[in-house]
Structure formats: structure tokens, C-alpha cells
Amino acid sequence: MFNGIVEEVGIVDALERRKNLSVLKVRARKVLQGTKRGDSIAVDGVCLTVTDKKKDVFTYDMMRETLEKTSLGRLRRGDQVNLERALKAGGRVSGHFMTGHIDAVGRIEQRMTEANYEELSIRLPKGLGKYIVPKGSVALDGVSLTVGKVGKGRFSVYLIPFTKQVTTLGSKKKGDWVNIETDILAKYVLNRGKDA
């Protein structure tokens, strides 16, 4: 479980593509403190298990589905990624509850700069509209955000200067892809009793 408060921006050291199981290596410092093999770390919002740790580089194994259904398959050496360690029992939840299971990948359609913030407009992937509501929670690349506007086939979020500085969202451009995880509470409420 995560809460969408990015602890560190890491750097992709390598993405070794293999037939069924690819290996991602990420360079970081802060999130490695106290981290051991088997721990979960969200990489751009995707929950991955640490399989190896050396100095300032940690390694993950990724199934083909992870590469195909998230933006991680588009990563290249030197790319920046948002990192967050799993929540600790008794810790604060400053964002919202997130599982690290990505619902879809969306594309940034527009980036508008205002005096004190920026608005990102994201193309809404099919089937997610019912989970995206104004003032509701959504995660983009592992960053907990509040939905600003919802329109036909798109939604917007607002980025304050701090969020732009401490996450990769500050450097995203029109046309870039982002991992989307909708609010887990909305999923449970809307799906309650469907198959019971």
C-alpha cells in the first residue's frame, strides 16, 4: 500500500528486456535506506518487488504484462522515475491509499501554465470515467493528486510548484504517457455487490 507522496526521483540505470521476465535497475539513495530484498517500492506508481540491492542501485523483475500495461515499458537509461516505499503501519497518509496496480496509461493532451500552478489535461482511457470525479483522488505516475475538471474523454489535475519540483510531473510534456491509478475507494463503492 502506498499514499502517493513521492520520496525521491530515481534514475533508470538499465532496462534489460528478456522474453518473459525483464529486469529494471534504478539508481536512488533515500528509498534504499532500510530497504531489503522482497520489499515493495512504487516506481512511477507501479508496485514492484526489490529483487537485488547494491550500493545505490536496486533491481526489479518485471513480467511482460507490466511492460505492456504501464509506462515502464517505454523507459530508457537515464529517465527519471518517481519512487515511494510502501506505507508503514502507524505512518501518516498524506495523499490517498494506492495499491500500485495501474488501471491504464493516459496521454497528456495539454499543459497550461497559470500564475501559481499548472494544469495538466489527460486523455481519459475507456472504462475509467466512472472512477474519475471532480475533487476525487487520482494518481499519475504514483503522485497523489486531486481531480480538477472532468470533461468528455479527459480530466485535469493541477500542479503546485512544490509538486513540480519534487516529482517527474514537472518535466512531463504534451504527448507524454502517465500511469493512472484511480481511487480504490471509488472502485469498491461502484463494484460493490456486482458479482456477489
Describe the function of each predicted region.
Residues M1-A196:
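Conserved loop->alpha-helix
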